[in-house]
Amino acid sequence: MVGDVHGHFKLLTAALDKLNFNTELDRIFSVGDLIDRGPESIDILNWLEKPWFHAVRGNHEQMLIDCISGHGDIPRHIRNGGAWLYELQPDIQQELSKTLQALPLIIEIELSNDHTIGIVHAEAPVIQSNDGWQEAKDAITGKSGEQHQRQALKTALYAREKIDQQDHTTIKGIDRIYVGHSTVPSVTRLGNVVYIDTGCAFSDGALSLVDIQTETMISISMSP
């Protein structure tokens, strides 16, 4: 599991080399925000073609989709590291948008030890305080109605309430949930939610990866 890459795919490659990542046996999952701020955002197209690489959609992917569709705030996107997009030909922009629209908002993984792992970019989209993982999935897929779906989308992509409140409440119906979005100085756990964006978009940050079987982790610093 890798935190927000933000266009630093060479750094991700270095991390996988360090881990002796085997493309025949291993899989890598991403909490989203693969693009913007870093120098290799366009490489996302190549990475998403790899059969062993799986990602959820982050808010930066959503910003790209919105801007290309004509419903986004392009100046805001540029301020947040999206200038690279507008240097591309329109057909490449459309290809990127189409590819990113296909990314799921939630991924669920069954491990060999019968544990279930969830992945979402910002926060599990629980709408009501007693909701669990199943209710979050129902909300994001529209089974709980259009209003709940809109709220769930916003929560999944942008929310920071749990970490802002240092809420250690366990989300029922799932063993662990991995999220990014909120930058933390080191991999941080609140209840059964694990925050793994350690800020590789910033000069004093790092890219962190967690083995979801063993819960061991490595971080590669952005500073020399």
Regions found by a protein language model. Name each.
Residues M1-I44:
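N-terminal active-site segment of His-dependent metallophosphoesterases
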Residues D4, D33, L48, G58-N59, ...:
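Divalent metal-coordination and catalytic microenvironments
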Residues H6-K10, D36-P39, Q62-I65, P125-I127, ...:
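Active-site environment of divalent metal-dependent phosphoester hydrolases
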Residues E24, E49-H54, L105, G173, ...:
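Short glycine/proline-enriched coil/turn segments at helix->beta-strand junctions
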Residues R27-G32, H54-A55, I117, I177, ...:
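Hydrophobic "anchor" residues on beta-strands that sit immediately upstream
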Residues S41-I109, N113-I117, T141-R150:
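Active-site neighborhood of divalent metal-dependent phosphoester bond hydrolases
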Residues I92-V120, P125, N130-S182:
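His/acidic metal-ligating clusters that form di-metal
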Residues E161-I220:
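Conserved beta-sheet core of the metallophosphoesterase superfamily
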